[in-house]
Amino acid sequence: MPKRIVYNISSDFQLKSLLGEGAYGVVCSATHKPTGEIVAIKKIEPFDKPLFALRTLREIKILKHFKHENIITIFNIQRPDSFENFNEVYIIQELMQTDLHRVISTQMLSDDHIQYFIYQTLRAVKVLHGSNVIHRDLKPSNLLINSNCDLKVCDFGLARIIDESAADNSEPTGQQSGMTEYVATRWYRAPEVMLTSAKYSRAMDVWSCGCILAELFLRRPIFPGRDYRHQLLLIFGIIGTPHSDNDLRCIESPRAREYIKSLPMYPAAPLEKMFPRVNPKGIDLLQRMLVFDPAKRITAKEALEHPYLQTYHDPNDEPEGEPIPPSFFEFDHYKEALTTKDLKKLIWNEIFS
C-alpha cells in the first residue's frame, strides 16, 4: 500500500496527483482554486540532514534569481506560520508533465526532437555559465518537459558559483572530508571531476550535456559505469585513453595521472560507427563535447552556434546572463560550521525576503 503523503498547504490549493519523489522531497500536481491553474508543488523536509538544508537553500536562491524560459519557474514559496513549527518547505512552481529520462525510455525521438531538446538544455546552460553558475548535476531526469516539448532545467541543489578572481574553484579547504556533497550521478560526471578531488568549472556541465546528447541518440546511457574504475574504462573506451604528458596536463594530481597510465590503452572509437543512423553534424557536436581536456571542450555558447543546431540557433534570443558574485552562496564557505538551526534561519530569511 503506498504511503500517505501529507501536504500542509494553503486551502487555496487542491492536490491532484503524485508526480515524483526523491531523497528529501516529493512533487505533486495541484489546482490553484482561485484561478483554476494547475501547478506543481514540491514539498521538501530539509532539516533531517544539513546536506538537505544546504541543497534546499541553493535551490531556492537560484530559482528566485533566474527568470529564463529553460529554467523552471517558481511562482511562490509558502510562508510558514512560525519558526518553531517550520519543518517543511513548499515550493509552488510551473507544472511540467514529464522529464527527459522518461521521454527517452518510452519513445523513439526524431532528429528534430533531439536537436530541440539539446538546444534548450544548452540555452539554459549558457545563461547559467554567463551568470557564473555551474549546475553540476545535469542529467535527463533533471530536464523537465511539458506537452509542447518545452524543456526546463531543475534541481539546483548541487550548484556552485564560480569565483573568477580565485586561483581555482574547489571546495573550501578542509571541507572535502566531513560534509562532502558531490553525489551527482556518476554516469554524467566529467572525467576531471572523478580524477581531481573537488575542482569544478563550466566545462563539467558541457561534458554532462554531451552524455545527454549521446543518450538521446542511443536511447540508453553512454557511460553506465558500475563503479569508479568501470566508469573511467567506459569513457576511455570511447574517447580513447589519454597517455601523453600533453594529454594529461589538465590533471594536476600526480597520483591521478599515474592511475590513468595504469589503465588499458584504448584508441578513440569511431563514433560514426557507433551511431550509424545519426546526423553527422550531431556526431561532430558530440565529439566536441566529450573531450578529455576541459580546456579543449566546446563551451555552451559555442555549442549553440554549431551547425547541428542551426535550425533553432538565434543569437538575439540566447541570453548571456549577468555574473553573480561569489557572496551569493556565501554560506558555502563556512558550511561545516553551520548548525541545523543556522540553516533553518537562512532558509526562513530567503523565503521571507
From Swiss-Prot:
The cross-link described as Glycyl lysine isopeptide (Lys-Gly) (interchain with G-Cter in ubiquitin) comes at: 345
Q: Which residues carry this modification: Phosphotyrosine?
A: 182
The record's active-site residues are 137
- Cell compartments where the protein resides: Nucleus; Cytoplasm; Periplasm
Modified residue annotations for Phosphothreonine: 180
Activity regulation as described: Activated by tyrosine and threonine phosphorylation after pheromone treatment.
| Binding, ATP | 19-27, 42
Motif (TXY) positions are: 180-182
Its catalytic activity?
A: L-seryl-[protein] + ATP = O-phospho-L-seryl-[protein] + ADP + H(+); L-threonyl-[protein] + ATP = O-phospho-L-threonyl-[protein] + ADP + H(+)
Q: Which Pfam families match?
A: Pkinase (PF00069)
- Kindly list the GO molecular function terms attached to this UniProt entry: ATP binding; identical protein binding; MAP kinase activity; protein kinase activity; protein serine kinase activity; protein serine/threonine kinase activity
Record's signal peptide? none
Q: Which chain regions cross the lipid bilayer?
A: none
Entry's free-text remark on domains: The TXY motif contains the threonine and tyrosine residues whose phosphorylation activates the MAP kinases.
Q: Please report the name of this protein according to its UniProt entry.
A: Mitogen-activated protein kinase FUS3
